[in-house]
Amino acid sequence: MKALLLEDVRKISIQEYPEPPKKDDHIITKVNAVGICGSDLHYFSEGGIGSANVGSGFVPGHEFSAILMESIPEMNLEEGEHVAVDPAKPCFKCQWCKKGYENLCPYVEFIGAPPFNGAMAQYVSIKKHQIHKIPKHFSPETAVLLETLGVALHAVDLS
């Protein structure tokens, strides 16, 4: 598959990259659209954010929509459906996750944040709980914006 790789500060390229391996608790998705977040710009222009430094060969991108490469019967999702993806993979074991505050998980793995490669690739492996069905009239580009919309709505809720 092809992927966009950050090779160094201000240096990117599109290269052949290994397809994600199939894992029991993951679904392979075909990336449909990817947004460019401010964090992606920091990774490109500065090589990281704080202690989150990207190395050579990092694939950015956490705001994305995808096409399912297989059905998920328990979620009533069919192969080929367009979905939105939550880039956060909380542990579901810590005190915060057990209380329902997965957003506070100190062990969260975040697609597209070092050291976890992102969605600027043709395929991404994600856990089922990260997949969200979207209305058929949503374009792939609209679905990309759902992650940022969620952040904004959460900020409004807290205000």
PLM features: what roles do these ranges have?
Residues H26, H42, E63, V144, ...:
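Active-site phosphate/pyrophosphate-handling residues
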